């Protein structure tokens, strides 16, 4: 009887402690603005932001331009199909903000996002993995 009680207590304790030992995977932060963890590119203040909705629709705010995208996402896999970069620059940007360097960075970032294949949480950051790895954090404003 004592052995049975001890075994029962061990099983109950293991069940209670298992979630702490193996925390549940965090879900992807759908609907949140995810800000690229990078140094600002002067002269503008705009930073790339990725927003993915639960239905797979996405908006990618790049250094200068914004493009729509479709995203397929699973536990750890992700595939981003960005729309084409618009030729025209945004009207709402200040003069000189979209420098040739920023326009080139738009093209590079869009290509990097199209190449990601997996994602995961690390602390408070969402990491995207592909030929170019990227770190995004939830926007706090």
What spans do the regions from the language model cover?
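Lipid interaction determinants
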Residues: 2-6, 10, 15-141
């Amino acid at each position: 009887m004592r052995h049975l009680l001890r075994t029962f207590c061990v099983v109950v304790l293991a069940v209670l402690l298992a979630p702490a030992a193996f925390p549940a995977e965090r879900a992807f932060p759908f609907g949140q603005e995810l800000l690229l963890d990078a140094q600002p590119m002067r002269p503008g203040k705009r930073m790339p932001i990725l927003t993915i909705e639960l239905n797979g629709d996405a908006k990618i705010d790049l250094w200068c331009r914004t493009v729509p995208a479709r995203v397929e996402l699973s536990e750890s896999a992700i595939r981003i199909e960005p729309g084409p970069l618009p030729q025209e620059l945004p009207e709402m940007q200040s003069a000189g903000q979209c420098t040739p360097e920023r326009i080139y960075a738009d093209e590079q970032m869009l290509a990097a996002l199209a190449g990601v294949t997996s994602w995961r949480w690390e602390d408070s950051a969402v990491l995207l993995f592909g030929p170019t790895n990227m770190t995004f954090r939830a926007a706090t404003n």
